[in-house]
Amino acid sequence: MFDLTGKHVCYVADCGGIALETSKVLMTKNIAKLAILQSTENPQAIAQLQSIKPSTQIFFWTYDVTMAREEMKKYFDEVMVQMDYIDVLINGATLCDENNIDATINTNLTGMMNTVATVLPYMDRKMGGSGGLIVNVTSVIGLDPSPVFCAYSASKFGVIGFTRSLADPLYYSQNGVAVMAVCCGPTRVFVDRELKAFLEYGQSFADRLRRAPCQSTSVCGQNIVNAIERSENGQIWIADKGGLELVKLHWYWHMADQFVHYMQSNDEEDQD
């Protein structure tokens, strides 16, 4: 179990929908500090969160997840002045725009990776940090393909690949930072939007999706926090239909373990 009591949490996402509902649940867990980094101001949401737990300090910064890493460093230098340290980093920024592949990939994958690369040194035990947990909020179509939202699905597959790679013991044994992902199923805030398919052949399906049964943002947010509390390094969870399910990970390339062992053995030989 991962105890959130007293933790300093940094949430990178728009403070609405799933992110807002997740933050509401976090505020009931006696966290000490919550930093929210999002693209637009939402003072009503911040006030709503603060009313749940007045003793928890909430900080807000406008943040563009697609900015260059050099700019991110400036932001997080400022964030650390207020936060002192980060125990939990949650990446929740998302975009589904099949007409704008670059923006979709930059928001969902590249921006998330740059954010993680920027924050990791602050959390790394060998660099003066205390370790902690990185949570990548992603989608079930990062596990199974979507013939309708091809660009979105590709970006979410990338999130899963990045999560599993960064969670490898090669890193975790040294930096003490666990990495996990939560894959959300169809959720009301997503399907309420006007959705465009990657190719016109899939548009009728995209239109019908808006009428499909979906989980609420509040239930999804609750299960994201449940997954965090139950998390172990490298785990992938599915939050869908009001439930929470642990993904059984599978290795398709059977030489993967041997290859990593070979690289580690060569490193040890070089040190000798």
UniProtKB/Swiss-Prot annotation:
The active site is at 152 (proton acceptor). The keyword Ion transport does not apply. Keywords: Oxidoreductase. The keyword Calcium does not apply. InterPro entries: ADH-rel, NAD(P)-bd_dom_sf, Sc_DH/Rdtase_CS, SDR_fam. Signal peptide: none annotated. NAD(+) binds at residues 11-34. Gene3D superfamilies: NAD(P)-binding Rossmann-like Domain (3.40.50.720). PROSITE patterns: ADH_SHORT (PS00061). Substrate binds at residue 139. GO terms for cellular component: cytoplasm. One of its GO terms (molecular function) is oxidoreductase activity. Belongs to the short-chain dehydrogenases/reductases (SDR) family. This is Alcohol dehydrogenase-related 31 kDa protein.
